[in-house]
Each structure stands twice: as C-alpha cells, then as structure tokens.
A protein has these predicted regions:
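Patatin-like phospholipase
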Residues: 1-162
Length: 162
C-alpha cells in the first residue's frame, strides 16, 4: 500500500510505503496525505512537512508504469470525462479544475497503457458530479453523495471494465 503526499520543501511526490520512501507509520502517512490546502494544515513527519498528494496528481497512477503489474485500477474522483454545462458560477469553476485534473489522469493512463498495462478507469458520472456539488469537501453533502453512489457505482464499474 502506498499513500501519496507531497513534500512541501521539494515539491516531490512521496509514496509512503514504497521502498525508498521516507519511513512513516500508516497513521502518519494518512495524516500527511490529508493536508489539503485551505482545508487541513500540512503535517510534519520526521522533520519534513507534507500535504495531500492530490496537489501534484489526482491519482499518481503513473508511478506504476515501471512496475511488474499487468493491470491497474485507477480510481479518479477528481477527474471526469462527463460533458456537462453547469450554470452556477461556482460549478463552472469546479469543472475547470476537474478538467485540468482529468488531463493529468489522461496522461497517466496513456503512460500506463504505453507500458503494456491494462487500465480500468473509474471516475464520477454526471449523477455523481451533481451530488458532489462544487465543493467535494462539503460535509452536508455526504449523505447525498453516498446515496447517489449506491445507485451509480455498479453501472460505473461495469462500464469501466467493458
């Protein structure tokens, strides 16, 4: 298991749990990976400060390109290839950020496929995006997101598997 964070001094992605990465307990690694800018403070582990790995990549799937695995399941909640035209100004901003994240995931998936791996890509559909709203960190939407996922997940996975 790798837990992704970004070293705030170097800007490098750190896959805690991978050989060669700094040593950290799983609790420290999870806390470091949850240092989401503007929501949660950076976390110090062994004299280094870390923030959420999603700052550098929504999935860090590209780190598996040189691995010996044949298949990679990419869970990309911050990406979406769903075409929609939200009306709310805040939703329009959210979609711009999401489109940027999607281009990163597109590149990572292409790299994995180029290296011969089968990739199963799972990301939100239109119903999921509506449930998320413009702020995925909004605790008031948790129930709506959960209920929507109960409806959409099976079909989303079925479509991803092909």
């Amino acid at each position: 298991t790798w837990i992704m964070a970004v070293d705030t001094d170097s800007g490098k992605r750190i896959p805690f749990g991978k050989g060669g990465a700094p040593s950290a307990t799983i609790a420290d690694a999870v806390c470091a990976s949850y240092g989401v800018p503007f929501w949660c403070p950076p976390v110090t582990v062994a004299d280094r400060t870390y923030i959420d790995g999603g700052v550098a990549s929504p999935t860090s799937a590209d780190l598996l390109a040189d691995s010996a695995v044949d298949e990679v399941i990419v869970l990309a909640p911050m990406a979406s290839r769903q075409p929609d035209q939200p009306r709310s100004p805040l939703m329009k901003i959210e979609r711009r950020v999401r489109r940027y994240m999607t281009t990163i995931v597109d590149r990572e998936v292409a790299l994995l496929e180029k290296s011969g791996k089968r990739v199963i890509r799972i990301e939100p559909n239109a119903q999921d995006l509506n449930a998320f709203g413009y702020n995925m960190m909004d605790p008031k939407r948790r129930r709506q997101v959960y209920d929507t996922a109960q409806i959409t997940t099976a079909e989303t996975v079925r479509m991803a598997i092909g």
